[in-house]
Amino acid sequence: MTDAVGSIDMPDAQDEAPDSKKSRKGGKRGKKGPLKRLALFYRQIVAELRKVVWPSRNQLTTYTTVVIIFVVIMIGLVTLIDYGFSHAAKYVFG
């Protein structure tokens, strides 16, 4: 097909995609009801939680102590920065 100035380009027959409807895969998943899918979901949750490596009591105590100490240090740091900014603002603005 030759394109002239001002002509309308029409798509060729081989350019068009075939009309294909997406078919749903029936299989086992498509036929389960909502309660069975919910039960499967909870079974999968339990199966995944069994794979988790839980910390021992000693490790848990250590991790908790480290987190609490870190939080206390961060609270102190933010308090000091806030105290410094408030005194600087009082000095500048009276």
Swiss-Prot record:
GO MF terms, alphabetically ordered: protein transmembrane transporter activity
GO biological process: intracellular protein transmembrane transport; protein secretion; protein targeting; protein transport by the Sec complex
Stretches for region Disordered: 1-32
Keywords, sorted A to Z: Cell membrane, Membrane, Protein transport, Translocation, Transmembrane, Transmembrane helix, Transport
Basic residues bias: start-end ranges: 22-32
Disulfide bonds: none
Membrane topology: Single-pass membrane protein
Quaternary structure (record): Component of the Sec protein translocase complex. Heterotrimer consisting of SecY, SecE and SecG subunits. The heterotrimers can form oligomers, although 1 heterotrimer is thought to be able to translocate proteins. Interacts with the ribosome. Interacts with SecDF, and other proteins may be involved. Interacts with SecA.
Protein task: Essential subunit of the Sec protein translocation channel SecYEG. Clamps together the 2 halves of SecY. May contact the channel plug during translocation.
The protein's name in its UniProt record: Protein translocase subunit SecE
The organism's taxonomic lineage, starting at the top: Bacteria, Bacillati, Actinomycetota, Actinomycetes, Kitasatosporales
